[in-house]
Amino acid sequence: MCGIVGYIGKQQAYPILIKGLHRLEYRGYDSAGVALINPAGQLNIYKAKGKVAELESFAEAKDVSGTIGIAHTRWATHGEPNTRNAHPHYSETEELAIIHNGIIENYEVLRQSLIKHGYHFLSDTDTEVLVQLIEYTKRTDNVDLRTAVQLALKQVVGAYAIAVLDKSNPDTIVAARKGSPLVVGIGDGEYFLASDATPIVEYTDRVIYIGDEEVVSLSRNQEPIITSLSNVRMTPEIKKLELTLSQLEKGGYDHFMMKEIFEQPQTLRASMRGRVNVEQNNIALSGFIDNKERFLRTKRIIITACGTSWHAGQIAKYAFEQYAQIPCEVEYSSEFRYRKPIISSDDIVIAISQSGETADTLAAIELAKANGAFIFGVCNVVGSSIARTADSGCYTHVGPEIGVASTKAFTAQVLVLTMLALAIAREKKTIEEELFLHLIAELNRLPDKIELILKQNAAIHDFARVFTYAQNVIYLGRGYNFPVALEGALKLKEISYIHAEGYPAAEMKHGPIALISQEMPVVVIAPKCPTYEKIVSNILEIKARKGRIISVVTEGDTQVRELSDFTITVPPTDECLQPILTVIPLQLLAYHIAVVKGCDVDQPRNLAKSVTVE
């Protein structure tokens, strides 16, 4: 959620740190700060509430010299968003400075202990407790910074990614992580540190992903020293970044979200490349092929995810049960991990996360593994925690998704999970070969069909203006399109701040119908499908109560068009693939409403792209 950047080397650190913070803005934040050790050995901290630009303005007339520094964007957890609570934080003597992502659960116990030892606190944060604890350990045990960090973190309960500067050792950054991501970039006699690779890619493509409960010491012109908390030396594994700098630019679009919506034809092709082969009539997913027997003997699939990824899991549930004929449950990771679920070694747990770093999903994986389940990860970020923790998995390969509201990652997740369900079904012979071959052909047609939908962008922009007045919106769908209703409502909530709810259309009569009025727009997802006539009946019920209807229908449908105030069409496809098409108009609708309202589309208030705290 927060963002960490660090640099040590030959260049001036400040410009690199500020550029890195801008790269991390998509993660969500409410304040920013930087710490630098200047050539005279002074440790300077500058911070500001608001955007990184506010920090730049504040630091403009300050001493920002130095070739070593750390910087941070904060998303408030402990203490309100203000300059006092912003990171970095000094230690009591101002010898140390720290930045931190995560939550220290036992911070109050540690705080009271430190107060008894004469320490004072200037902020309300758990982070300040951590830097005071490290300084106290360093002083009382008479150890160096790396050892002090190791010893201090052994006392900590919770998740963290930290970076620490020591005024008395101006040639070293010490960092550590547990449950929150941290990556080191390797340059020529210099090192870069960040929460993810986006601030690093401009300078190097060689990285080390720091493991859980590992501490790394970075010094100029020396190899990184990586140890466990118990000081066991680890051998770093250097990876090559697949990310490119051009992927982090808007490419002529006004917002990253619009760029990412329009990228979906390409990203779906990328997700299918080498996996869906029409000539060979095959779906080849290596994560499935390498573990085929495990999938074929499983008695249950459990999908665990959060937010948009949970909606993708709900769609996949239909496909796993319809085609692979495997019972499937979909769980919120945050609930699953705490409710003592019954898990066995016969289960496959599919964990979905765009970032691969979602804290609750990682905790759910840990619980499932402890009970013997096989873990299959579906994520986008190569080398992420979920990718490294899972027994097997499948990358979505959509490239970096910068907009906080997920778009291209969602459709790729649905695609990959549908491909997996069909691959299992073919091996189990629970799908007719003719239908399987037909669906392979339809998968390949999806990108072209999305391009047709995107041609309606201007029309959606025009009628979106009419609905900016709305304070509440209901989204309705059935079957495979019910989770699309949930996703459409979430998109509108996230970026336009309009309250919206998704319901199964048949449930409208069990409560939501009481809300229908001229002031309550209703978005109905009504493509041709087995429940089409029932959806039409629902629309008639809305019309009878003077509700304003926006419908998503199959091309050529005149019946629903005549009942609707506004209609968006999608090309025909099989029911199991419809969500990949029907969600596109809802993404565009939410986007245009938010833009007309003047909302910050890419960085909506209070939201973070990667939820790395519980």
Q: How should these model regions be labeled?
A:
Residues 1-250, 254, 266-300, 338, ...:
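Conserved short alpha-helical segments that host acidic/polar catalytic motifs at enzyme active sites
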Residues 4, 98, 164, 175, ...:
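Structural beta-sheet core signal
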Residues 264-268, 272-302, 392-521, 594-614:
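Active-site phosphate/pyrophosphate-binding segments
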Residues 296-438, 442-445, 525-570, 589, ...:
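Glycine-rich phosphate-binding loops that contact phosphosugars or nucleotide phosphates
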